[in-house]
Amino acid sequence: MVEWVHTRIHPKKVQKVLLQSDVQSKSDKSPVTVADYGSQALVSYILEKELPSESFSLVAEEDSGDLRNDGSQEVLQRIRELMNDTLASDGENKVLSAEDVLTAIDSGKSEGGPLGRHWVLDPIDGTKGFVRGHQYAIALALLDEGKVVLGVLGCPNLPLASIANTDQSSSQNQVGCLFYATIGSGTYMQSLDGSSHKKSPVAIQVHVSAIENPAEASFFESFEAAHTTFSLSGSIATKLGVKAPPVRIDSQAKYGALSRGDGAIYLRFPHKGYREKIWDHAAGCIVVTEAGAVVSDAAGKPLDFSKGKFLDLDTGIIVTNQKLMPLLLKAVQDSLREASSPPTGPSL
Ligand SMILES: Nc1ncnc2c1ncn2[C@@H]1O[C@H](COP(=O)(O)O)[C@@H](OP(=O)(O)O)[C@H]1O
Ligand SMILES: [Mg+2]
Ligand SMILES: [Mg+2]
Ligand SMILES: [Mg+2]
């Protein structure tokens, strides 16, 4: 199952088109590109084709609404060309019409929930990073009775070597990682293009950092200030005695990098009112958990993927190894308390 997902998703082909494409704006002002739509259409089309016997349910980020407007003909045409080129290079004879593309995108309209099986797709996670030429990920997971049982994370711009090393060794030039995990079977990483790498000729099992002293830990957070509260993560890091500056990268590549021990902690504290979506965390969550991490909200509760499209959680998402989690949780809760009731100065 995982194997055919690997061979079909070729994000680098999509990336080339992205560089020439217009970036559209969704109704919530967030960006979406032909690559987001193309990736969703492709993954949805292939999954449905490969799983004919199963009742197919896909919860995916994008929908075809804006593409059906009169002004979107050109963009739709580009997505169609991109998809047909990719299918042709994969030996597929069928040429898809514009309507086929829209239908494939809209296959991702399922609401998910606690019953049965649902695929969960973020066709391009970290679109802002993608547009900037930074990190992004293609994230696919499978829910079974509300639990994530499989996750695949393609990170086309992530170096195969650890990003913890600041010296730009030659292996930093080799980019493109594929992480995958199935429940109870660990997490594996291989090069995205299938080429051999001296460290990972085929696939290697990866593990999170075993650091026990928080002063030696480094932490990941979003690149985008709008996606997390830097002042809060700064306060948590100070309480833990973390010396290294934060590593700010886009997308679920953070979960992938964490799963192989490039850093020890991931902190995500969205601003008030933001509701996290399952496709932003499902694949990353199983990839990092199967590598030995604990993922929880600020109350210490595991993420619940059974509630539909949204994660219903108490403030924030935190990830680290089992040893560090109790210390991290205390630092998080102390910092949140202080942020909600800042200490008052002495009265005059
Ligand atoms: N205000 C906000 N707070 C937290 N996350 C947000 C946000 N606005 C958008 N996001 C989500 O953050 C994701 C990117 O996360 P990161 O900051 O780790 O790169 C986006 O995924 P997409 O790029 O798939 O839309 C989007 O779903
Ligand atoms: Mg988006
Ligand atoms: Mg996303
Ligand atoms: Mg996305």
Task: Kindly give the residue locations of the regions a language model identified.
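Residue-level marker of motif borders
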Residues: 31, 117-120, 150, 275, ...
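Residues embedded in well-ordered beta-strands
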Residues: 4, 57, 118, 139-141, ...
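Buried hydrophobic packing segments
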Residues: 43, 142, 284-288
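An extended, acidic
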Residues: 13, 157-162, 166-348
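Generic detector of contiguous secondary-structure segments
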Residues: 26-49, 132-140, 239-258, 278-279
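N-terminal subdomain of lithium-sensitive/metallo-dependent phosphomonoesterases centered on the IMPase/IPPase/PAP
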Residues: 1-124, 157-160, 192-195, 232-235, ...
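DPxDG-like acidic metal-binding loop motif
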Residues: 99-106, 114-184
